[in-house]
């Protein structure tokens, strides 16, 4: 889907064409996470808490892949708008080299030092034991993930979002089936609890990787080929590093900072951790539309900027922001609407249920803050290659404001859990003035392609 000159109404047609598959993909991801929590809910509160804490490493690693994929997507979307497929393959190889190296390192740490990893989040020995068994198996997942996430990012950058969605759908559906099998001991299998979740995830990601190679074999343009690992371009490597390193730093800094929320809550007790593990799942459902619009918008705007039409990109960015505000409001209402159902099925103790109720209500407004910032920082700004702003903005906001405030409130003032959580959830609104000012200046709109690479 190479994007050519568009009429005024084509913006919404192209946005929906890109957004719908991404929404489905994100909903599937949220549904699988929900299924994990629902099934672990019947295993016990400790299993939910341990997997929730151990999953912070997966979340950080995902943000590493997302940061690398951002640099690849920015370049590939603009070069696709220009019709340069050779440059896309070179960028794919560069990205794979980085992602595979990082995956290998993290997988080794997860296999040999899982207890040390869990100690970062909790002193509770039961949670450490459960989480360590989960992490050791997840090392296999990390190896597969490092390859598939790059290939899926390249597919999305050239508009093949439906194929990307189908591959994720395969992994997600298989994950749910295998989770049920290993958690509850279906089809004669033993009941493995949290360890079963890790096995199911590893197997589903392995199947997804095989499916990626099949799609690559059938594809006429974007392929997943080992030879791309050995294609070198000094110019494109420099461009990739210039775009990816700030994006990678931004995403990892934000993700690690967000994981620090779990550190704070983890030291406030297992009730807070268990409640938060359910809240994260519900919040992910509420933000599905916002993140889909940001992802689709970055692809669409990147294609337009690659053609050199910067004024049109600014016009489309304005419409995209309006869509995001509406999506944020809808997301908050979704969280509010499903809160009674979550409270009905949860089997937590009374204290954790109390935390759960009010944490969910806090997230009805938090989603709006996250929606606007995500659309602008991860969508609009990055489409034009402006990745440094997000790094500076999020790092200052999270590490100089939210994290110190959370630790101070929890361990110095010793405020109640819900007050600590409320203060942590003010981070998105603190950076609004800065983000909106940068958007209005319009310096983010740039054509980052080169005539010769």
Identify the function of each model-found stretch:
Residues 69, 138-157, 164-172, 197-212, ...:
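Short runs within selected transmembrane alpha-helices of multi-pass transporters and secretion channels
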Residues 22, 26, 37-38, 55, ...:
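Transmembrane alpha-helix boundary and packing residues in multipass membrane permease domains
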Residues 23, 27, 31, 35, ...:
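Generic alpha-helical transmembrane segments of integral inner-membrane proteins
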Residues 27, 31-49, 116-125, 181-192, ...:
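Helix-terminus/linker motif at the lipid-water interface of multi-pass membrane proteins
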Residues 48-108, 145-164, 262, 275-339, ...:
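Small-residue-rich hydrophobic transmembrane alpha-helices
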Residues 17-36, 137, 148, 171, ...:
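Transmembrane helical elements of multi-pass membrane transporters/channels
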Residues 40-59, 126-130, 194-196, 236-243, ...:
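Interfacial/gating helices of multi-pass transporter permease domains
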Residues 1-19, 76-141, 189-244, 301-367, ...:
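Short alpha-helical transmembrane segments in multi-pass integral membrane proteins
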């Amino acid at each position: 889907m190479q994007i050519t000159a568009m009429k005024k109404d084509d913006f919404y047609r192209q946005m929906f064409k890109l957004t719908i598959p991404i929404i489905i993909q994100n909903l599937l991801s949220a549904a699988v996470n929900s299924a994990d929590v629902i099934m672990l809910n019947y295993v016990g509160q400790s299993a939910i808490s341990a997997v929730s804490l151990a999953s912070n490493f997966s979340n950080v690693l995902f943000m590493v892949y997302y940061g690398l994929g951002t640099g690849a997507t920015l370049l590939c979307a603009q070069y696709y708008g220009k019709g340069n497929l050779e440059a896309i393959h070179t960028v794919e190889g560069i990205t794979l080299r980085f992602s595979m190296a990082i995956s290998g390192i993290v997988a080794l740490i997860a296999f040999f030092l899982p207890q040390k990893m869990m100690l970062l989040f909790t002193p509770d020995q039961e949670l450490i034991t459960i989480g360590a068994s989960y992490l050791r198996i997840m090392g296999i997942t990390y190896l597969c993930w490092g390859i598939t996430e790059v290939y899926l990012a390249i597919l999305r950058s050239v508009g093949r979002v439906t194929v990307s969605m189908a591959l994720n759908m395969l992994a997600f559906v298989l994950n749910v089936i295998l989770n049920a099998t290993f958690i509850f001991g279906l089809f004669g299998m033993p009941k493995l609890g949290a360890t079963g979740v890790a096995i199911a995830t590893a197997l589903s990601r392995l199947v997804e990787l095989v499916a990626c190679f099949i799609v690559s074999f059938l594809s006429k343009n974007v392929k997943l080929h080992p030879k791309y690992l050995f294609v070198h371009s000094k110019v494109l490597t420099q461009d990739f590093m210039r775009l990816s390193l700030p994006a990678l730093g931004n995403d990892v800094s934000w993700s690690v900072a967000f994981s620090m929320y779990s550190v704070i809550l983890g030291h406030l007790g297992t009730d807070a951790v268990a409640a938060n593990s359910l809240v994260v799942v519900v919040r992910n459902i509420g933000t599905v539309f916002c993140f889909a619009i940001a992802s689709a918008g970055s692809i669409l705007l990147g294609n337009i900027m690659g053609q050199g039409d910067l004024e049109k990109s600014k016009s489309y960015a304005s419409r995209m922001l309006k869509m995001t505000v509406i999506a944020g409001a809808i997301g908050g209402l979704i969280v509010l609407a499903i809160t009674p159902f979550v409270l009905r099925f949860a089997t937590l103790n009374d204290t954790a249920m109390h935390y759960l109720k009010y944490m969910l209500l806090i997230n009805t407004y938090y989603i709006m803050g996250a929606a606007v910032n995500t659309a602008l920082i991860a969508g609009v700004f990055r489409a034009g290659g402006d990745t440094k702003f997000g790094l500076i903005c999020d790092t200052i906001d999270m590490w100089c404001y939210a994290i110190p405030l959370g630790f101070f409130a929890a361990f110095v003032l010793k405020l109640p859990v819900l007050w600590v959580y409320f203060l942590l959830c003010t981070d998105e609104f603190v950076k609004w003035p800065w983000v909106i000012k940068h958007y209005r200046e319009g310096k983010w709109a740039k054509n980052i392609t080169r005539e010769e690479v």
